[in-house]
Amino acid sequence: SNNGGQLLGWDLRSAGELRDILFADIGGTIYMAGSEVFRKAVIAMTESGKAAIDSAGVSPSEISLVVPHQANIRIIETSMRKLGIPFENAVWVGDKTANTSAASIPIALGYALDSKRVKANDLILLVGFGAGMTAASAVIKWGEING
């Protein structure tokens, strides 16, 4: 529709060969090789984010807001630098919520909406990574904002 949001581009990837650096055993025990996860998470978020931006046919400078997985501020800072997008364009709420895993992106987007950081027609990059190693990104054009 003319005033609705739109999915402009996306990326989904996995690197199963990295399964052993971040996984949960049966029973719920989580194993993480911290420094290796940091390095691979930055690569995954950067490559997936760039692929979604390319898929959308836009440039990093056109991205108004980045809503990343809230695992670690250092991962976000490094990924933003490598994406060529100022850190100020990222939403960071991990200091309020900690790492809420798969819920971190929608929670961060909710904070961005509540704080009026999202405007009609903004191009927003959603980008995350997780165990397995997996990564996913989407560029959306935000629709009309009511209220």
Short names for language-model regions:
Residues S1-I43, E47, F129, K141-G147:
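Condensing-enzyme catalytic core mediating Claisen C-C bond formation in acyl metabolism
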Residues W10-R13, D54, V67-I73:
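Short N-terminal helix-initiation segments at or just after the protein's N-terminus
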Residues S14, I30, K50, N89-W92, ...:
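Short, functionally important structural connectors and interaction interfaces within domains
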Residues I21, K40, A44-A52, E62, ...:
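Non-catalytic alpha-helical scaffold/packing segments enriched in small hydrophobic residues
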Residues A33-S35, P60-E62, V93-G94:
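A short, structure-level motif marking secondary-structure boundaries and short turns
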Residues V42, S64-G147:
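Claisen-condensing/thiolase-fold acyl-transfer catalytic domains that form or cleave C-C bonds
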Residues E47-S64, A112-R117:
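Phosphate/pyrophosphate-binding loops at sites that engage ATP/ADP/AMP, CoA/4′-phosphopantetheine
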